[in-house]
Amino acid sequence: MTNERKEVSEAPVNFGANLGLMLDLYDDFLQDPSSVPEDLQVLFSIIKNDDSIVPALKSTSSQNSDGTIKRVMRLIDNIRQYGHLKADIYPVNPPKRKHVPKLEIEDFDLDQQTLEGISAGIVSDHFADIYDNAYEAILRMEKRYKGPIAFEYTHINNNTERGWLKRRIETPYKVTLNNNEKRALFKQLAYVEGFEKYLHKNFVGAKRFSIEGVDALVPMLQRTITIAAKEGIKNIQIGMAHRGRLNVLTHVLEKPYEMMISEFMHTDPMKFLPEDGSLQLTAGWTGDVKYHLGGIKTTDSYGTMQRIALANNPSHLEIVAPVVEGRTRAAQDDTQRAGAPTTDHHKAMPIIIHGDAAYPGQGINFETMNLGNLKGYSTGGSLHIITNNRIGFTTEPIDARSTTYSTDVAKGYDVPIFHVNADDVEATIEAIDIAMEFRKEFHKDVVIDLVGYRRFGHNEMDEPSITNPVPYQNIRKHDSVEYVFGKKLVNEGVISEDEMHSFIEQVQKELRQAHDKINKADKMDNPDMEKPADLALPLQADEQSFTFDHLKEINDALLTYPDGFNILKKLNKVLEKRHEPFNKEDGLVDWAQAEQLAFATILQDGTPIRLTGQDSERGTFSHRHAVLHDEQTGETYTPLHHVPDQKATFDIHNSPLSEAAVVGFEYGYNVENKKSFNIWEAQYGDFANMSQMIFDNFLFSSRSKWGERSGLTLFLPHAYEGQGPEHSSARLERFLQLAAENNCTVVNLSSSSNYFHLLRAQAASLDSEQMRPLVVMSPKSLLRNKTVAKPIDEFTSGGFEPILTESYQADKVTKVILATGKMFIDLKEALAKNPDESVLLVAIERLYPFPEEEIEALLAQLPNLEEVSWVQEEPKNQGAWLYVYPYVKVLVADKYDLSYHGRIQRAAPAEGDGEIHKLVQNKIIENALKNN
């Protein structure tokens, strides 16, 4: 394949109606260069060295008296801005546009003769060397801007990007395919179309979400990956919903036809998995429908060895977008070094395929696009392809969006948008070429709107004519792109009509041969759907011990700063207190310091850490201070980049004000780099429910559905402290509802040392079959609570404990109170004021998996026990009560009374008034500590 493109030198900018003034300034420049602004000095220097420019400008200027130039400039500007409204981008059922701006020569009282007398340089700053006059140039622009590709870029604020696009679009360029390449492209389309037709005929009514109508998507992806291969990009991450997914799996990831057809026949597809290991397909024990599944292909089919990944995706359209971005960034980051990661955007690229109804309809897209240029999230430019079949299930565009195009919402992110006719396959290839060039040049997103149609209903059981009869009258009569392109090649003499039909038949023959290999009796039989044995146990404690000197060395390093670095005095006093656990007998390690010490030891073990969230560098509650700021210069210093013997990176970023996209990004990052300790911290745990789709459809179910492992950790500040219903609850109950089959660990801690050991245990589980998400109901006021802070000897040895108790005299205990997190601390502090040896407080540090054995063993040691009580801050219908009740009920059986103390059932999580909160909280504590 060759690209014929005429290169031209840089020429002066448009002057339009100000041309006369510019010529006067040019004369001034010739007399005294310093008499004009610096930018014009540079421009006029170029003009001075090109004898052809000034005469052309002066000739043009003489015709300017009647406003001709002004009208020419308005015409040119309109073509660039609005030519897309008359572009030939609709294969069928073109919309009837109203109020289209003026776009014709006659609309501006211009004619051929007038335009032939004007320099082509007026039309575009690089046309003077290409066309004889403005008329020729305008004809070229009309053809370009009203052709099978509609370009939108004038909304971009960056002048360099806008100028690059203008020159790239307007410079004569044609993707020239030789005959062999045209035949190869036709064969690609024949395979795409033939696959769909075969399934449609042989598995009538089976859902497959056909690609027909936007078939060019597959050649576009193949072209993209080929260009990426030439550029040395060896990791391609693709995200898409279900439309066309089976075709992408078979023709981009090269999943064998036998495997795909086996899934339609409900037989075991894995017997047809390539033995060379080039195709990785993971599976969970519950499984998922075939059009949600992804895979990873290692192949050199596109010119170099590449890893092509199609992400697993639920039916929640578009939610995979941030996951793909996170996976891409993980592939780009080098984390096996001290300090911060280095990011090479040339290592990997994301391709995200959207639907035209879902793209403007789902806010996750805009959260994700907002990540595009942020330091902590950029992937060097994503290629977005809208598979625009101009319908969403039964909803037509007039009811689906408030804009002209589904892509209009992308304009706010300053990205170019190309609309391309899905029936013009060569135009779709050109759109990809320009998009990839732009990404390479500017490392920014590009959106391609592949405008086609949907051959059948939303799924193959659906009859679209019930709700959309008129469009489907024309769609049913419209030839497939395979036939459209095939006839074009026949007319060009590239292939004969017999060859065209012969190859179409050959595709069907290959599919039939694959079908015949499958034994219908080989049915899949897995009624028990058992989870892996590795998940039988809870997260295992990390029993590694540390010497006092080792932790002191780390602590000293974290409190050492560059010479001349000026820390705010108020903050410096806080940080200096972190020396006390090592030089004072009564010194205690608080929550933030425990975290810093844990992170440092994890980095020494060679596990990279990535922590993101709103305000996470400092911490919402001003406790972490992981990134320090010089109060005089504003420069930053990150102590965790300078840990002694550090073997992996520490990466921390304040996230944008987004939850869903950021959590999806971190999930994807961890799936791609399973060695990375990824942590997302909510500003308040209450806001975590903005990410509920990621929790439900990925984090807690991905391994069960897809065999996709994640060890993402969530820090969710949670405690009832009188701050109202939106700053109290991380909705603990929802995470406990999602907990099953040892798919996660959920904790609510009361000890800084237990937090230290928990973080180390989670880090140790990464990249193993034991890895799973960790949910931490993290503290707020407890961050500085001395009851939570612990002496350093609790950090030098031991491991994570699922339950904690104080010392007790077994025969005196008649009442056991089970509580968690801040509720446990409140009870402990209240009991300290009025000691009662008959009451034993037990901190349930790990809620899931529930520590039944540990509690049962404890209760067995108490011969005079009469009552077990569960105490919580949350309303009875929230928090942990409904989750723990079945477990505790079994433990107490008929031996002890079981009671509940907490807020009554409420619709809202907490009281809005701080004083009322205190009254309610104190009453709960008072009632709980009564020993009847």
Curated annotation (Swiss-Prot):
It catalyses: N(6)-[(R)-lipoyl]-L-lysyl-[protein] + 2-oxoglutarate + H(+) = N(6)-[(R)-S(8)-succinyldihydrolipoyl]-L-lysyl-[protein] + CO2. Its EC number is 1.2.4.2. One of its GO terms (biological process) is tricarboxylic acid cycle. The keyword Cell inner membrane does not apply. GO terms for cellular component: cytosol; oxoglutarate dehydrogenase complex. Belongs to the alpha-ketoglutarate dehydrogenase family. Homodimer. Part of the 2-oxoglutarate dehydrogenase (OGDH) complex composed of E1 (2-oxoglutarate dehydrogenase), E2 (dihydrolipoamide succinyltransferase) and E3 (dihydrolipoamide dehydrogenase); the complex contains multiple copies of the three enzymatic components (E1, E2 and E3). This is 2-oxoglutarate dehydrogenase E1 component. It comes from Staphylococcus aureus (strain MW2). The gene is odhA.
